[in-house]
Design a protein with these regions (language model features):
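C-terminal (or distal) subdomains of carbohydrate-active enzymes
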Residues: 3, 10, 16, 22-25, ...
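Loop/turn elements at helix/coil->beta-strand transitions in domains of secreted/extracellular proteins
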Residues: 4-8, 33-36, 65-70, 97-101
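Structural recognition of the beta-strand scaffold that forms the well-ordered cores
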Residues: 8-11, 27, 37-40, 71-72, ...
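Acidic (Asp/Glu)-rich catalytic clusters
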Residues: 27-32, 60-64
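Short acidic, S/G/P-rich loop/turn micro-motifs used as interaction or catalytic elements
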Residues: 77-81
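Metal- or metallocofactor-binding catalytic centers and their adjacent structured scaffolds
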Residues: 113-228
Length: 574
């Protein structure tokens, strides 16, 4: 906050019951130290009637001997101000509280007084959490849409200067994104009908950014020299390097059926590029015996902002070295030692770490008012079928397994990769629950009282005490003196942990816009988050896991390389 010129903060949440606070005014400092922010936690009176007894609350919880306090009053719902009657009441009762005098002032005026008394204020170190723990995960569509808009806009802005019209479209997109960070919109606590406009606006921001991104890519393709071979063009629209695998379905014309016989990839210098073919997304073009329109899976390395090409050549073969293994029991493993089986995740000679899914009972309101943690008891565990091997190398092996939990259906696709230490999961959930929470439970490799979580702009060490807290992109689990487990999960926004396990909160199914007390189920109640959801995970294990690598992987998942075809210079066939 200080780096953006904000040295004070008016606190309304967390409440006194949710977090221990030293008083109504204190200094707030991050774990990393540095400049402090003055935090003021005043009482708010959003009612028409004022009483001396009520407003006297503002003189409680002050540092000993502190002679100034703050009272906020008015009427309205997320806005408004004092009425004429309230103003008259304050004037009439200016000195009604013994030893104190009420004066009309401003927040800036009060904070300036606090700055002069900074040394007398207590200090709080760390995050101001938790509050309304249900909001970390409820109504997932708005959270996914907002994060997608943020990353697409960031990608579009990383490219060269845009024309005025495009620049204005991106600016308008950022305004939409900033507006929908509002604490009820992003929190998932608005009415269902309100989210129609919210998602439309965030979709518009995504569309503007996506259009700018692809128009810029097309402009760069025009500048490429002609080539007699068809090319796959890659642009890393990111501020960090990309090292990993890409998937692309090139349109290779009427000779597509020959792909498996004599097509292969080469780079700009005619050197072979390792690859494998996969089933394409359109089922109509898939034939496992003779792929009609294959999806190409290949490795790429790109610097920030770099554009590169690979070329589709003919008359050769795929000489890619096998880097994965499919075992007789349907387990899959990589040459880096990463292994998945139905029993769990393993690396080398390390322990097998189970990954499970559980349903919890959750009768709390939309915000989960009054709760600091969710139930420890699972109502039901997931029931999986038998795994089926889908891809078997040479660069990637995958297994798909379907399951059920409650009334919901799940499909999990597990992958391992040649030369990569992580295990990847794509989890599709068709959510059909009421008053339930879906948690992913992961065993930690070594018990620890502390974990490291990604948070906005940085990371924080947190106690594994079972409290529900928000997360950004990843968590790092286990004793720092032993190999640890890292989970990169950019589509998950809340978790809790104990020394021996962590539970990532995937979905809730509360009534929308329901504030306790309320009827058990209103006739027109809308249950949140029903339908299809997709989650992406990468699991790492080792002694030298760095936060920089975890952030890089999360960034690659959130800001994927842009891939397309280029045919300039190819001979015509029609």
């Amino acid at each position: 906050m200080q780096s953006f010129g904000q040295d004070s903060y008016l606190l309304t949440r967390p409440s006194w019951e949710e977090m221990e606070q030293p008083g109504r005014i204190f200094r707030w400092q991050g774990y990393e130290g540095g400049p402090e922010v003055i935090v003021v936690h005043p009482p708010f009176f959003n009612s028409h009637e004022l009483t001396v007894e009520g407003v006297s609350e503002c003189i409680e919880r002050l540092p000993e001997g502190y002679e100034h306090t703050l009272l906020c009053l008015g009427v309205g719902d997320h806005g408004g101000g004092p009425t004429e009657a309230q103003i008259a009441w304050v004037r009439e009762h200016r000195e009604a509280i013994d030893g104190w005098r009420m004066e009309f002032s401003t927040l800036d005026g009060y904070v300036e007084i606090a700055r002069q008394s900074r040394d007398r204020l207590p200090t709080v170190v760390g995050e101001l959490q938790p509050h309304a723990i249900g909001c970390y995960s409820v109504y997932r569509p708005v959270k996914v849409a907002l994060r997608r808009a943020e990353h697409l806009l960031a990608q579009a802005e990383l490219l060269s200067q845009h024309d005025e019209e495009t620049r204005q479209a991106l600016d308008d997109g950022w305004k939409r994104v900033a507006f929908h960070h509002f604490h009820d919109t992003l929190a998932g606590s608005c009415t269902p009908t309100a989210y129609i406009s919210v998602l439309d606006q965030l979709g518009g921001a995504c569309a503007a950014a996506d259009e700018a991104l692809h128009f810029e890519l097309r402009r760069r393709i025009v500048d490429l020299p002609d080539d007699s071979l068809q090319r796959i063009v890659m642009l890393n629209a990111n501020d960090v390097p990309f090292h990993g695998f890409l998937e692309h379905e090139p349109w290779i014309g009427p000779w597509a059926k020959r792909w498996l016989k004599d097509c292969y990839l080469v780079d700009e210098n005619d050197q072979p590029v390792p690859f494998q073919t996969m089933d394409p997304e359109p089922i109509a073009f898939s034939d496992r015996n003779d792929t009609v329109l294959p999806r190409i899976f290949f490795r790429a390395d790109l610097e920030p902002g770099e554009l590169r090409v690979v070329r589709i050549a003919r008359g050769g073969s795929n000489g890619t070295k096998l880097g994965i293994k499919v075992e007789a029991n349907e387990a899959i493993s990589s040459d880096s030692g990463a292994r998945w089986s139905m029993a769990g995740l393993a690396w080398g000679d390390g322990p097998t770490l189970p990954v499970g899914l559980s349903l919890l009972r959750d009768m709390s309101d939309t915000w989960s008012h009054g709760l600091l943690r969710f139930s420890e008891e699972a109502m039901e565990k997931v029931s999986w079928g038998d795994p089926k091997i889908i891809d078997s190398g040479p660069l990637m092996a995958s297994a798909i397994v379907s399951g059920t939990i409650g009334e919901s259906k799940l499909t999990a696709e597990w992958r391992v990769f040649a030369g990569e230490p992580y295990i990847e999961l794509k989890l599709d959930v068709f959510w059909a629950e009421r008053f339930r929470i879906l948690k992913m439970e992961i065993s930690t490799p070594s018990p620890s009282d502390i974990r490291l979580d990604g948070v906005m702009g940085t990371n924080l060490g947190r106690k594994n005490d079972g409290s529900e807290l928000p997360m950004r992109d990843w968590t790092l689990l286990g004793d720092a003196a032993s190999p640890r487990l890292a989970v990169v999960a950019p589509d998950v926004y809340g978790l809790d942990a104990r020394p021996e396990r962590a539970r990532l909160t995937l979905l809730r199914s509360s009534m929308m816009a329901q504030h306790d007390p309320a009827p058990p189920l209103a006739p027109r109640a809308v249950i949140s988050d029903q339908g299809a959801h997709t989650f992406r995970f990468r699991f790492f294990f080792g002694e030298s896991l760095s936060v920089e690598d975890l952030d890089r992987h999360a960034s690659a998942m959130q800001r994927p390389v842009v891939v397309t075809d280029a045919t300039g210079g190819m001979p015509t066939i029609y």
